[in-house]
């Protein structure tokens, strides 16, 4: 149990409704490793010299942390102690949350306090519709702008099963692992499918160091996401 801004949060934290847009990219593994070096974790090398970065936009609609927007830069990493590589290694990999701007103070405090997520306050401009888009800016500087083209619907039988995956974070010198569960519905996928523009914020320069913007491997959207988050565990 945690108390955030005078509100009691019982674990696991529940997200009952959210929608998601995601873009997956192949990036230079050494550049990705340099970006997360302080964490002590190792990027998952899916091919020689290549790693995977996933950029996500979430609109949390109904959950214990309230209603808010969130952008995240996630680097896929091996579990601590693992040296697996190749595409099959992604099955056990977790998402290291490197950037995580949000637009509400409560989720910012909860994220940083409970899980060590690097949440910072940001401004979002959201363009709903068949071709979904958003901009995220911090202190008046654009981080990234993304425009998604709709994908092909995927039957819920393939996506609605609850999945459990770890996420990792590094904040104030501490690396943490958090186990979470997720179930998706209303999912669409497509190859490519996103147009992105980087701004002049330091986060944007980090994304540029990975070779972005470039064509995405795959993009997806989910009309509804249900999630739970356990307490974090310090691992380094």
Language-model segments: residues:
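Aromatic- and glycine-enriched beta-alpha-beta binding-site module
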Residues: 58-143
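N-terminal domain-onset segments
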Residues: 1-64, 68, 80, 203, ...
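Interaction-surface and assembly-scaffold signal
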Residues: 1-6, 105-236
């Amino acid at each position: 149990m945690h108390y955030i801004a005078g509100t009691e949060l019982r674990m696991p934290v529940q997200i009952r409704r959210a929608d998601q847009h995601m873009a997956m990219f192949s990036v230079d593994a050494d550049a990705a490793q340099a970006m997360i070096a302080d964490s002590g974790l190792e990027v998952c090398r899916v091919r020689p010299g290549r790693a995977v970065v996933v950029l996500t936009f979430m609109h949390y609609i109904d959950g214990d942390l309230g209603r808010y927007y969130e952008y995240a830069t996630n680097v896929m990493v091996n579990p601590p102690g693992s040296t697996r590589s190749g595409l099959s290694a992604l099955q056990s990999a977790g998402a290291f949350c490197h950037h995580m701007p949000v637009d509400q103070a409560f989720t910012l405090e909860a994220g940083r306090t409970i899980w060590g997520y690097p949440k910072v306050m940001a401004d979002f401009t959201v363009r709903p519709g068949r071709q979904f888009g958003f901009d995220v800016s911090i202190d008046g500087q654009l981080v990234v702008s993304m425009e998604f083209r709709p994908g092909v619907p995927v039957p819920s039988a393939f996506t609605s099963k609850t999945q459990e995956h770890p996420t990792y974070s590094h904040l104030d010198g501490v690396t943490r692992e958090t186990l979470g569960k997720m179930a998706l519905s209303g999912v669409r996928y497509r190859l490519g499918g996103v147009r992105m523009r980087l701004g002049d914020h330091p986060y944007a320069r980090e994304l540029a160091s990975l070779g972005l913007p470039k064509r995405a491997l795959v993009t997806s959207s989910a009309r509804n996401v249900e999630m739970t988050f356990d307490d974090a565990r310090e691992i380094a």
